[in-house]
Amino acid sequence: MKLTDDLLQKFNDQITLELEASIVYRQLAISADNLDLSGMAEWLRRQADEEIVHANKFIDHVTDRGAHAQIGAINAPTVGKDLSALQIFQAALAHEEKVSEAIRELYRATDAAGDLNARPLLNWFVDEQIEEEATAVSYTHLRAHET
């Protein structure tokens, strides 16, 4: 099934959001580096790389279906520069929640259009986002350890 113009736009929006997530994670890694939290910064850099992999999965899906993937405008990260470790993880969680909601919206749109071809990819992403949010939530439990 060929992608409709509406679904193509929604997939392109998701591609852009995944790339934006990569930039957000990279900015958060810079904040962690500024706090001399090298392990945390490394984890955030790996997350940034993973978001690019996610964007590529969506790009491949669009391309495999004979459509043209198009990256949209990517906003500069709005996360502050003077964040605590807890605030960094809270910002990561907030962005993961934003990505999760966008994936659920894309899932609902493809379902409404009867696009079963997108289901395997989107099922994978729904599972992935559960894991991503759970990890970020676990790190926000640092609050109990902050002085």
Predicted regions and their residues:
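Conserved small/polar residues in nucleotide/adenosyl-binding loops
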Residues: 140-147
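Acidic/histidine-rich alpha-helical segments that form the ligand environment
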Residues: 10-17, 21, 25-28, 60-61, ...
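Conserved alpha-helical segments that form or flank metal/cofactor-binding pockets of metalloenzymes
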Residues: 33-73, 136-139
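DHp/HisKA histidine-phosphotransfer helix
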Residues: 7, 40, 44, 121-122
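Extreme N-terminal tail/first-helix region
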Residues: 1-12
